[in-house]
Regions:
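Alpha-helical recognition/docking segments in bacterial nutrient-uptake
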Residues: 1-2, 60-163
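N-terminal helix-turn-helix DNA-binding module of bacterial transcription factors
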Residues: 1-61
Length: 163
């Protein structure tokens, strides 16, 4: 099985340093347009695919937002999720969508799983019911969180709320 091309392969193909390729991948303005085009062409020519997981390990920011909705079968929440996802994309974020189906236990499990996958933040429309498990996971994650439409009563003042 052939190995995936690396940043070093791109640098060699483009005739630049590994640091220059890294700057291009980060979108740095300090790279000349001609060099940027050369690096992008080299990436295409050798089939280089940016490894976002590796970048996440280096930067500690995944660019992923966990959007946890209480009931995606409700057309209101479906529309909200679609619109919010598009707005997040405009800001450079990818969205991971989770439906808690009004189950607080499932909600806390989903949030925990999203934390394990390294989301950079949460937007949650909390499920009704027991809040302790969800709050415990959110508190331990220390991840920016915005509550929408509903708020966790015991989280008042801890996580911003937007209705």
């Amino acid at each position: 099985m052939k190995q995936r091309p690396t940043i070093l392969d791109v640098a060699k193909q483009a005739g630049v340093s590994k640091s220059t390729v890294s700057l291009v991948l980060q979108g740095s303005a300090s790279v000349k347009d001609e060099t940027r085009k050369s690096v992008r062409k080299a990436m295409t020519d050798i089939g280089y695919v940016y490894n976002r997981s590796a970048a996440t390990l280096r930067s500690a920011s995944s660019g992923l937002i966990g959007l946890v909705i209480n009931d995606l079968r409700n057309p209101f929440f479906t529309e909200f999720a679609a619109l919010f996802q598009m707005e997040l994309a405009k800001a450079g974020f990818a969205t991971v969508l989770a439906n808690s189906d009004e189950d607080p236990k499932l909600q806390s499990q989903m949030i925990s799983s999203l934390v394990e996958h390294g989301v950079s933040g949460f937007i949650i429309s909390p499920s009704y019911g027991e809040e302790a498990a969800t709050l415990s996971v959110l508190d331990a994650a220390n991840t920016p969180t915005l509550q929408v439409f509903r708020s966790l009563e015991r989280a008042e003042g801890t996580y911003p709320f937007l209705a």
